[in-house]
């Protein structure tokens, strides 16, 4: 296996561990894999046809939905647990990836 395939496989393995619950910064993954962000971006895109961010988001969404489906945690608690920098960023992230704000997502599940 060449280095590029190894890096891509390790990146995907890292995502499968649930790490995106707290880590969604592409730079973090590059550092953990001891490669530059530019290299990681290039080999993931070349090997899979997708961006690093799309993989990170796809790994994050099920975790996010799970927390939102658990009524016992407030939106602030979920935002904190998942290391979002602010509640407003958390809300924007949900709107972008779930098509609605976290509170609307919750009320739609009732």
Regions found by a protein language model. Give the residues of each.
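Residues within helix-turn-helix
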Residues: 27, 38, 74-77, 87-88
């Amino acid at each position: 296996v060449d280095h590029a395939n190894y890096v891509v496989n390790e990146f995907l393995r890292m995502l499968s561990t649930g790490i995106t619950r707290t880590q969604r910064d592409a730079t973090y993954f590059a550092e953990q894999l001891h490669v530059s962000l530019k290299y990681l971006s290039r080999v993931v895109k070349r090997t899979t046809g997708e961006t690093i961010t799309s993989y990170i988001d796809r790994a994050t969404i099920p975790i996010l939905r799970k927390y939102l489906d658990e009524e016992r945690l407030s939106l602030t608690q979920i935002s904190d647990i998942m290391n979002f920098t602010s509640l407003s960023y958390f809300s924007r992230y949900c709107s972008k990836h779930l098509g609605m704000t976290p509170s609307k997502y919750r009320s739609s599940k009732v």
